[in-house]
Structures are given as C-alpha cells and as structure tokens.
Amino acid sequence: MENKEKIRSLAENVWAYNAAFLRWGGLGLLVGGLGGFVGALFAKSVAWATAMRGANPWLLYLLPVGGLAIVGVYKLCRVSGVGTNEVFEGVRSNKGVSILLAPAIFLGTTITHLLGGSAGREGAALQIGGSVATFFGKLFRLNEEDRHMLTMCGMSGVFAAVFGTPMAACVFAIEVVSVGRFCTSALFPCIVSSASAYALALVMGVAPEHFLVENVPAFDISTMWRVLVIAILCAIASMLFCWAMHSGAKLFKKLFKNEFLRAAVGGVVVILLTLLVGTRAYNGGGMDVIERIFEEGVVRPEAFLLKIIFTSITIGAGFKGGEIVPTLFIGATLGGTLALLVGLSPAFGAAIGIAALFCGVTNCPIATILLSVELFGGESALFCMIAALVSFLFSGYFSLYSGQQLIYSKLSEKEINVHGH
C-alpha cells in the first residue's frame, strides 16, 4: 500500500512538472515571440530616429513641439503618469498596466530620440513588455500569481530583443522588482521568453550590443586597488544620477503644473544646453560615444556629468525613453576617465564603470554580472563582478526606480522593506 502511494505521488508530481513545463514554455514562447517582434520594431525605430537626427541637425529645434506631441499621445491613450514603476507594481499586486502604454511609450521614445532628447530605450522596453504581458494575462484570464510571472516574461522578452542580452534580461526582470526576493519559479518562463525574443530579433536584423575589451590587466593587487577606486567613485556617481533623475522630475512638476508647458520648456532647455556645450554628443542615447571609448580610447572627463544633466532634464520634463543606455554612457565615460588617471586602459575602465554604474542605479548584482559577460566576454568578468558588488554596497538604497522594493539591508540579513529613492 505504501509503495502504491509513493508511485501515485510520483506520477502526480511528474504530471504536474510536465504540465508546468508545457504551460509556461508555451506562454513564454508566446510572450517572447510577440515581445521579440515588437522589441525588434522598437529597436529599429529608435535606430532610424537616431540616424535621421544625425543627418538632419535642425530636428533638434523641434524638440519642444515633440514634447507637446508626447504629452498629447499619453493623454489620448489615458496613460499619463504611467511608467516603469507602475509595471513593477503590477508584478507585486493585482494592478496591471494598460495595453495602450505600449504604443504610447513606443511613439514617445521614438519622438524623443528623433528630436534630440537624452534618453535610452531599455526602460521603455520594460514598459512595452509589461503592457504586452498584462494584455495576455487578461486574455487568458490568468490568476494573480500567474499574471505576475507573465509580466516578468514580457519585461525580459522585450529587453532581450532590444539590447541583445537574453541572460541578463531574464534575471533582471525578476531581480529588479523586489531586490532580495528572487522568484526562482519565474526563471524558466523568463529565459524561454528572453531567448525566443532574442532569436526573433536576430532574424529581424537587430544586432546585439557587444564591446571588445582589449588589454585586460592581470588579476593582482596592483590592478585591484585601481578597480576598487573606480567602483567606489562610480557608486557615488550612481547616487548622483538617481538623485538628479528624481529631483529633476520633482522640480519640473513644481515649477510647471501644466504638462504641455513642462515638456515645451524642457525641450527649450535641452536646445540651449546643446548650443552651450557645442556638441550633439549628449543628445539621444549616446551609444556612439560608448563605442568610441572601446574602439579608440577617446573619452572626455566632463562627459559623465553632462549626460546626467541632459538626461535628468529630458526625462524630468516628460520626454520618454529609458535610463539604461544613459547609465552605460555615464559609467563608460567616468570609468574611462578614471582609468586614465590610475594607469589602466580606457576600454577596461569603461567596462568596470558600466558594471559599477548599472549595479549602483538598479541594485541588481546578479543581472549586472550576466550583463557584463554578455557585453564584454569572460576575460574581464571577475573584475566587473567585484566592481558591481562594491558599487552595490556603496550606493546605499538609491535607485532609478522609486517603485523598486529592497527587502533586506545591504549591511546585514535584517529585513527593511524600503523603496528605492
């Protein structure tokens, strides 16, 4: 009798695991397929906007008009004030985000890049993915827990399609919402979603991001103290960036209650700043600047600070886009500058800076390690891991996302349950 019970229990478990595999494999493929398609279109749209802006410098002077258009689109779609924080909240609660957020952020980000606002694309990808997943969750009438998992699938899928880092995308979507509480059951559906989205994006011609790090130094005491200096200073810069992003948004809302006026004024300020600095390097995402550091070792010491200013004004005024590419820009330029000061190659310093800045502003050390491997390869991975963990500790509870929940203290196992600031 006891053996029969064990056999029956084993059979039930096998069936449950097979059913979960088929169910979440199918849902992951579905969300990843659609997310990959939309994400690839989004990446191509941003690339087109960037090329058009480069070929037509006069487009910058239409930035205030673009701001008005973005506010109008968001009001038309009834998603004003909805962003990445609301997507995170949807993972933790029964609140979803409107499917109309996807076309709104798609169009808003494209306009921002076309006309010269300083923004990225990966934060927008998280919103598109969350919006698509919410739609499928309602369509299939999934329960609350399954909708949470599907939202993470959507986020990981579109992120992987846009940036070309499926491993980091899988873990980031799980890790970023509630730091310290890692939903391991979401790993399988998220990797199915991110891998399938990544594969489809490749087929559609979206090239993954990758940087060649030459002259990686030996792992010794002489190198390590230099890496630690870069990591700690990048952690401080990550706190400055988070503060600037939140303060910029609060200041614009305080000074200009009307959203249309806020966006128009922000556009004018970005135009004036661009004319003042005499370069277009800080408009758009800035991937070309990052590439030059790795390929030519060219870096300007003030670049990281100017990118913080441009991005905080752009996003604070109501323009749309992500914060991740600006984060990589700030990390690469600051890391490259510091590397020259301590006797390391700019490319190696840029890799260390990117890892430290990304971890400092997102509080996602595991995703940062995977991102470093996918972006730079394995040779510099140990240095990037150490830099990321040092920055994670020194950056405190600052975060780009006020909706991010930090479950545990960074100093002990004490449960604190605070939100990023």
Model segments located where?
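Alpha-helical transmembrane segments and immediately membrane-proximal extracytoplasmic
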Residues: M1-H421
